[in-house]
């Protein structure tokens, strides 16, 4: 078994069988999304985006799923934003909020944010949003200031994160390029209609998170799961214990990995053998990198620093990160700029350029995507 090609298969990067952003996010459990534009591409490349044969999701389609509330965005698992389903946001918050709050404690102390401040902040937000409306961060900050709450420095970041962790607010639809917030209860009710959200806690929640993780990201280790889930190793082991009967274990280089019993059948609709694409342009914070604490299956040690531990947008050739990329707009045209860490063959460069064109079709901006190379090796 090739670890990285199998991960690509179960994540839908190879032989994409998903067609709906919400179905993909549900399969993955959560998708890291602090860089919104990059996170949308991460969803898109798993939905056949930009296929030269036509079809596949576009950037606008992922936007539409987000704006409709089919997928939500909040701080969950770790102290950063993730895409998550309305049906899952409640139990995932209950599971992960206590540890994220622990991360916030020293910052609250430094910024003078105490329990009274948090209670008042939540009360203001609840009153402002209780009619089912949507407000931008700037609009909420204005209301907090009117209530004599200091939003300066980075205080506003932590006041909003607290409201998210409390299960009070989550993402609303974008207003132009601005993000809005809504009451989580209203957003979930509108999205689910009469359907019930999952009601999980304790080991049942740990087990469900483990199930989502290992089926959609295996082969992976229990340490990988602990990292991704923002939990202790003990919690990760408890979650794995709940679902290990549904998984298979194998040892590679002395390390135990867990994955779906049939890695090709584990992904809905999949019958595609795991294989490596010639090239990929992975977004920043992609789940093929950020989903694991050990990234050596895709990231050569020599490139760890230059790629920011694989978290920068990555150029991947035959399953290995060989460079980074960025999107810039020059005279109204999208340009994909490459920085390669090693020489690549003409065949590989052609595959990279093909991926850049695919990205352009995903954006659907009707502009030419050019590839410039700034080699640093």
Segments the model singles out, each with a brief description of its role:
Residues 301, 306-377:
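Glycine-rich, small/acidic residue-mixed loop/short-helix segments
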Residues 67-76, 80-81, 164-174, 245-252, ...:
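A short, conserved structural fragment
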Residues 93-108, 185-209, 271-274, 278-280, ...:
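Short, amphipathic alpha-helical interaction segments positioned at domain boundaries
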Residues 242-302:
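Non-catalytic regulatory appendages
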Residues 56-64, 150-162, 233-240:
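Short amphipathic alpha-helical interaction segments
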Residues 1-138, 142-152, 302, 335:
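Phosphate-backbone binding and catalysis cores of DNA-processing enzymes
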Residues 83-89, 175-194, 257-269:
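Short, cationic-aromatic polyanion-contact patches
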Residues 116-133, 202-218, 240:
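Positively charged, polyanion-binding regions of nucleic-acid-associated proteins
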């Amino acid at each position: 078994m090739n670890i990285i090609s199998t991960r690509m298969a179960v994540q839908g990067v190879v032989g994409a069988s998903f067609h709906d952003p919400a179905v993909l996010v549900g399969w993955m459990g959560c998708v890291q999304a602090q860089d919104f534009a990059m996170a949308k591409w991460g969803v898109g490349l798993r939905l056949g985006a930009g296929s030269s044969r036509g079809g596949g999701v576009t950037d606008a389609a992922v936007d539409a799923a987000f704006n409709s509330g089919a997928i939500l965005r909040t701080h969950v698992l770790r102290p950063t934003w993730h895409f998550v389903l309305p049906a899952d946001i409640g139990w995932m918050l209950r599971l992960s909020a206590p540890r994220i709050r622990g991360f916030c404690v020293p910052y609250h102390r430094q910024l003078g944010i105490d329990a009274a401040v948090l209670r008042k902040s939540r009360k203001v937000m609840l009153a402002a949003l209780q009619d089912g409306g949507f407000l931008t961060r700037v609009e909420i900050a204005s209301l907090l200031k009117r209530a004599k709450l200091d939003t300066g420095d980075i205080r506003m970041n932590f006041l909003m994160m607290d409201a998210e962790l409390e299960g009070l607010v989550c993402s609303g639809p974008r207003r132009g390029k601005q993000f809005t917030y809504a009451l989580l209860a209203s957003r979930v009710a509108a999205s689910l209609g009469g359907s019930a959200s999952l009601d999980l806690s304790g080991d049942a929640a740990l087990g469900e998170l483990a199930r989502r993780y290992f089926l959609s990201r295996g082969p992976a280790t229990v340490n990988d799961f602990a990292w991704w889930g923002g939990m202790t190793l003990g919690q990760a082991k408890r979650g794995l214990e709940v679902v290990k009967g549904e998984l298979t274990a194998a040892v590679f280089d002395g390390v135990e990995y867990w994955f779906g019993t049939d890695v090709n059948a584990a992904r809905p609709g999949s019958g595609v053998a795991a294989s490596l694409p010639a090239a990929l342009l992975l977004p920043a914070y992609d789940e093929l990198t950020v989903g694991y604490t050990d990234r050596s299956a895709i990231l050569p040690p020599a490139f760890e620093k230059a790629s920011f531990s694989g978290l920068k947008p990555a150029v991947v050739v035959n399953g290995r990160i060989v460079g980074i990329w960025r999107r810039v707009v020059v005279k109204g045209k999208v340009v994909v700029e490459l920085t390669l860490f090693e020489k690549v063959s003409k065949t590989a460069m052609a595959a990279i350029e093909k991926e850049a064109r695919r990205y352009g079709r995903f954006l659907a901006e009707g502009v030419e995507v050019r590839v410039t190379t700034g080699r640093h090796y």
